[in-house]
């Protein structure tokens, strides 16, 4: 199974890429994590956030591999515990279907992206920088995989 993080944003601070890679490279091939970056919409004086989100959404959805399960990261989604992430990861691995995690840009995801998703995942009730979300997702996927495989990285009480 492959997990794709398809995210709006390029040329982010180096620490974001390093943080993401730290966790992505720890995962084995049977649960690989790949990042696909989408250029943000051009934000000019004549544009509007709704137009920018729609443009980014079209390009995000165009990057989704066929027959993938799509989960959109959105503050209005469901909050999952670490154990719930592990449970879902196990289901995804059993199904053998690739999974896509969508991350919007600074203005979030357009309604079409949310409608096309099979699920909405809220990482926090806080508003998080979209670059930081990449690192959090990679760490949580690695933590869930560690939990499923009884690796000492995850220390539950």
Swiss-Prot record:
Q: Which Gene3D superfamilies match?
A: 3.40.1280.10
Family annotation (CDD domains): RlmH-like (cd18081)
Q: Where does S-adenosyl-L-methionine bind?
A: 104, 123-128
What EC class is this? transferase
Q: Which domain of life is it from?
A: Bacteria
Catalytic activity of the protein = pseudouridine(1915) in 23S rRNA + S-adenosyl-L-methionine = N(3)-methylpseudouridine(1915) in 23S rRNA + S-adenosyl-L-homocysteine + H(+)
Q: What is this protein called?
A: Ribosomal RNA large subunit methyltransferase H
Question: Which species does this protein come from?
Answer: Nitrosococcus oceani (strain ATCC 19707 / BCRC 17464 / JCM 30415 / NCIMB 11848 / C-107)
